């Protein structure tokens, strides 16, 4: 399966979710590769650090490619069971070329007005991609949300996202938890940490498509 984490807004947790899903799949003994298509190289650096510090943990093969990466993705999909793509947070050649070959798009969004304003153009981009890739499933993932259950922004964002025909709302809501930052610094996934709430969030996200 080819799973793309991408969107039109930076700083929404795409690399965090891409690396965490990669670890989740590695724990299931899946043969995976992580494709870092973001020039900030967050996923690539995370993978390198993991190999250097924790050689006994399941390792995540990572390659870095930029530009039109459709052919690279198709080649990797023949050699690996799953390809996880981390694309930059903007309308880019990497994002568009990934969308025409991906099976699944997860687009993380903060429950903020500035993030939600980007959804209309993303919705149109998905529609264009589906003209060439009818199998593409697209999910909006509410990410970095307040862990305070009394905050109403999640309900408001969910209501707003109902207006977009090309995007389904993922069941998972990923909260703004320190453990995600700790896991990134330690080159781990949260399922290798001790926070059960974060583990459940990644499990819920993974079970959206597995």
Regions from the PLM with identified roles:
Residues 2, 6-8, 12, 23-93, ...:
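P-loop/Walker-type NTP enzyme "switch/lid" segment
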Residues 16-17:
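Hydrophobic positions on the alpha1 helix immediately C-terminal to the Walker A/P-loop
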Residues 94-113:
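Inter-motif core of Ras-like GTPase G domains
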Residues 110, 137-152, 172-183:
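G-domain G4 guanine-recognition motif of GTPases
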Residues 117-135:
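Conserved C-terminal guanine-recognition region of P-loop GTPase G domains, centered on the G4
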Residues 157-188:
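Beta-strand-loop-alpha "switch" segments that mediate conformational coupling across diverse proteins
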Residues 184-199:
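C-terminal boundary of histidine-terminating zinc-finger modules
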């Amino acid at each position: 399966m080819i799973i793309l984490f991408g969107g039109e807004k930076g700083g929404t947790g795409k690399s965090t979710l891409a690396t965490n899903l990669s670890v989740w799949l590695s724990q299931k003994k899946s043969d995976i590769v992580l494709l870092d298509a973001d020039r900030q190289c967050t996923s690539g650096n995370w993978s390198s650090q993991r190999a250097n510090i924790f050689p006994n943990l399941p390792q995540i093969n990572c390659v870095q490619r930029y530009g039109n990466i459709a052919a690279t993705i198709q080649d990797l999909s023949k050699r690996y069971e799953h390809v996880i793509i981390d694309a930059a947070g903007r309308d880019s050649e990497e994002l568009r070329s990934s969308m025409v070959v991906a099976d699944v798009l997860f687009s993380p969004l903060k429950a903020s007005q500035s993030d939600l304003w980007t959804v209309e153009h993303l919705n149109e981009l998905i529609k264009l991609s589906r003209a060439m890739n009818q199998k593409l499933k697209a999910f909006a993932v509410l990410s970095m949300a307040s862990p305070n259950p009394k905050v109403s922004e999640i309900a408001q964002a969910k209501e707003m996202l109902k207006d977009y025909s090309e995007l389904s709302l993922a069941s998972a809501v990923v909260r703004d938890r320190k453990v995600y930052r700790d896991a990134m610094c330690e080159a781990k996934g949260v399922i290798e940490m001790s926070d059960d709430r974060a583990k459940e969030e990644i499990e819920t996200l993974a079970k959206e498509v597995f």
